Amino acid sequence: MRKTIQFLQLAFLLLLATACAETSPFKYESVPNDPLKARIYTLDNGLKVYMTVNKETPRIQTYIAVRVGGKNDPAETTGLAHYFEHLMFKGTQQFGTQNYEQEKPMLDQIEQLFEVYRKTTDEAERQAIYHQIDSVSYEASKLAIPNEYDKLMSAIGATGTNAYTGFDQTVYVEDIPSNQIDNWAKIQADRFENNVIRGFHTELETVYEEKNMSLTSDGRKVYEA
């Protein structure tokens, strides 16, 4: 509930800034000589909201920045932050599933099997456990609805749906019509409060593929040096 309130407050502030940026009743900070005239609001719950006004089009560019990135990865599971970024697009209890009550026991079983797999050292036993994980994952996938988050964003007119993981941040990006900010806020509140981890295997393959593609990027090599 607290996170829901955070996002609703964020939505209200953004809407207020678009409608009456010059008469905001909220206290804010600013940076001297900032050409964008950004306003920095700190809500009672500690959430920081950065806002600038662009009246060229009736749209709002949104960034939800989380203070976690590659530097927070455990030594034995590097890439975890990037992997989780991908899993944030897999839905919640409300969307991304045909029947969450039927899906949940299988997702719980997958999580338990992975924990056993992690603690098992015998290679033959690990292979047997992983085979079981594959089987349960396949059954769970029958209840999942692929790309439903993207479809929800498209339905409200959003473009540029994306995310990226850096050294100390993970950022989720949308470009939305200004009259859809309430719907955007409700979806994001549900997404961040009730995210369901599903589609483990397929998304892991996607992350591996992105990593393989980056191995030939000179810019990426410099960044990771």
Residue ranges of model-derived segments:
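Bacterial N-terminal signal peptides that target proteins for export
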Residues: 1-9
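Bacterial N-terminal signal peptides
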Residues: 9-18
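His/Glu-rich zincin catalytic helix
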Residues: 20-144, 171-198
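Catalytic zinc-binding patch centered on the HExxH motif and its immediate surroundings
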Residues: 42, 53, 156-166
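Short, glycine-/polar-rich solvent-exposed loops and beta-turns at beta-strand/coil boundaries
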Residues: 56, 77, 164-166, 200, ...
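Alpha-helix-centered segments that form part of catalytic cores
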Residues: 141-157
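Short, glycine/charge-rich beta-strand/loop segments that flank catalytic centers
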Residues: 167-170, 201-210
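Short acidic/His-enriched helical or mixed secondary-structure segments at domain edges of catalytic enzymes
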Residues: 206-225
